[in-house]
């Protein structure tokens, strides 16, 4: 099992210094989410081959690996120009992963919930173009349902991934999305079975609680989604239940601490999350 850190809260650390900083926080693995000087959100990668080589050397020197790259592109459109651009961005990102020796990439479906049929059609078109590249480079792709996407429910995401019917494609369970994707960690984890290879760990409040008034959004009836990525214990996700389900399912993949809420105390949060993950892994009660 790998325990990784998503270093988004410390993304302002220079890229070549990042591995040593992550090592100091007690992690041996980085799940590298978007950052402006590497692979930014929804735009073409900003890094050249020389910097990729230097980054790989810095990782080796620090004794830290990249568990996964996590790019986010609009490969499900629904706009066709956006989809084609996303495929170009993906192509370069896959090459970067290969040059780093990374064998895992993670992403979302990245379509629109108000256009689910069009988004899914665009997703399949992109998969037809990109799956051969993943195969050629020996890279796996792990997908997660996300709030405000054309697939938000965990069971629906698993069914779609099964429909892809490819050994390189698997499922990610994101704990801070629990209350958006079905609020059924044990059921979703069991249903995923061997398709579950990655888990994101952070806490969140149940936005459906208190008759939907845990949060009050304006204007009334807005379709906006709300969630958090908090330290474990600060929200309402049942982590005892979640880790119990992972044990029952024989999970042996990658656990990633992905707290985004506390940039002002990012070091303390990252250290705390590493400790809590170890506690849950050793607690068999």
Kindly give the residue locations of the regions a language model identified:
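Catalytic domains of carbohydrate-active enzymes, especially glycoside hydrolases
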Residues: 18-36, 101
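Glycine-rich, proline-tolerant flexible connector loops at the mouths of alpha/beta enzymes
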Residues: 31-59, 110-115
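Short, acidic/polar
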Residues: 12-22, 84-95, 181-189, 239
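Conserved, mostly hydrophobic/aromatic
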Residues: 5, 22, 30, 59, ...
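Active-site acidic/histidine proton-transfer and metal-coordination neighborhood
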Residues: 16-17, 58-62, 75-173
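C-terminal helical cap(s) of enzyme catalytic domains, especially alpha/beta-barrels
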Residues: 266-285
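Acidic/histidine-rich catalytic cores of soluble enzymes
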Residues: 2-5, 29, 66-69, 128-236, ...
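A short, acidic, flexible beta-alpha connecting loop/helix-capping segment that sits on the rim
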Residues: 254-269
